[in-house]
Amino acid sequence: MNDKEYMRLALQLAKKGCGWTSPNPMVGAVVAKEGRIIGQGWHQRYGQAHAERNALASCTEDPQGATMYVTLEPCCHYGKQPPCVDTILDAGIHRVVVGSADPNPLVAGKGIAILRAHGIDVTENVLQEECDALNKVFFHYITTKRPFVSMKYAMTMDGKIATYTGASKWITGEIARNHVQRQRHRFRGIMVGVGTILADDPLLTCRIEGGRDPVRIICDTHLRTPLQSQVVMTAKQVPTILATCCGDPEKQAAYQQAGCRVLCLEAHCGHVNLLQLMEQLGQEQIDSILLEGGGTLNWSALESGIVQQVQAYIAPKLFGGRDAKVPIEGAGVPLPDAAFRLKNSRLEQLGKDFLIESEVEYPCLPESWKKSEQ
């Protein structure tokens, strides 16, 4: 096996931590000696041992003189675990092959520098693109202190998320819906607007056996969420946050008694200030959010600049209907040049349906738009 093959194995190991390591990154490590794999491990859960330590602990023989393959630069600071560079040095590892550099300001090249200063041969950027993609959530969060937000919706090929009567179950098939449940396990939070609660009364939990429920975040400017809704009735079992501009203590108390947490935020254009909400959630180590909002909230999120990714599940169906709901509403952009452009798109077939996943590239405001607003 060559360096890339060992790193691919480390990547597969890292993915086993998906949904459990937040707000830490997913990391995998492989220890090889004289062409044999003698140890492997991954970061299994937040607060527990890191991948490098687990890989060394699993070694079937002395790792002295071996090579370690690790998807992310080893840490060099004390957190919930001791520095991984110390563990590597103590084990007598001769060479370290790294996939991604760690943008965490506490690491940021220091881990690699320490290893080299102690005479260890370090090879960088092996399968870097794949390793970077694995931890795009962590990279965003650790550098911005705000959650990585993925806007998710299911629609027909004519762009409808419901019929003109409001019916939306089900647009996509079972395979696509199961994929969504895996996303709910993967993301630390799930966010909707009060309109979704009023229309569908969703539970917003992860239905995968053994999966982790995301923190539920409801944007509810005036606290209209029914006390008998599923999210409120189960708030003592699943963490639930109501983000609101309503400062009425009596209204807030009813939700708090049910187990909800009420975040009273500033208003922006008549709605919850989403930037302020993201800053607050980031401070609470919510590093990622699956946005399952309706057209109004989705537009507000784009307009606020908080969305990093779009996941569009597309069913080969046509609903039609002038009044049928679409995934993004709001004012819209006045000119094609002002569009929110998407890049690095990926297409995946899920049964009869398709998922298009793209990164959001925010536009510069065109001069003609600026003039039209004056």
Which ranges hold each PLM region?
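Proteins enriched for Cys/Gly/acidic motifs involved in redox and nucleic-acid/cofactor modification
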Residues: G19-P23, I112, V126-A154
